[in-house]
């Protein structure tokens, strides 16, 4: 086991991450929202406004899952006292305007703050803008 993996498993936030990630892997807005605080902030830094509150987050996630078919390629996880940083790659199944399917890869970075109750209080998501722009343009999606 690598040193990074040993550190990840030693963090008290590792089990919180694991439960949280299951929500995303299974595309379950209710599970994801249940692990956030009532006053949570979820912010995809792509020019859009932050999503504020657990109920708004649940709706936002449901919309994401309805609009996009994506999976995860896991990268590094770094833990602090009240946060984790997660590098991952989004694997998007998209189609060109003529219907031809293609797969796009977009590098992502999550910065997640956890409150004293073990709830996700804030999640900031950063994406590789160039990769995302190229994928969406190829699919004819205007963002």
Spell out what each predicted region is.
Residues 2-12, 58-143:
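A beta-strand edge to alpha-helix "cap/lid" segment located at domain peripheries
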Residues 10, 14, 22, 29-81:
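A solvent-exposed, acidic/Ser-Thr-rich amphipathic alpha-helical stretch
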Residues 22-25, 34, 50-53, 114, ...:
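A generic signature of intrinsically disordered, low-complexity regions enriched in glycine/proline
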């Amino acid at each position: 086991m690598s040193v990074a993996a040993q550190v990840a498993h030693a963090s008290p936030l590792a089990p919180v991450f694991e439960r949280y990630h299951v929500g995303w892997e299974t595309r379950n807005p209710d599970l994801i929202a249940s692990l956030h605080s009532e006053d949570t902030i979820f912010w995809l830094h792509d020019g859009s406004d932050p999503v504020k509150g657990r109920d708004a987050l649940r709706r936002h996630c449901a919309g994401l899952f309805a609009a996009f078919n994506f999976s995860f390629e896991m990268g590094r996880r770094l833990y602090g006292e009240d946060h984790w940083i997660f590098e991952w790659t989004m694997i998007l199944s998209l189609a060109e305007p003529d219907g031809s399917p293609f797969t796009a890869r977009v590098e992502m970075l999550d910065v997640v703050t956890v409150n004293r109750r073990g709830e996700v209080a804030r999640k900031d998501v950063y994406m590789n803008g160039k990769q995302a722009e190229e994928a969406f343009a190829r699919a004819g999606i205007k963002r």
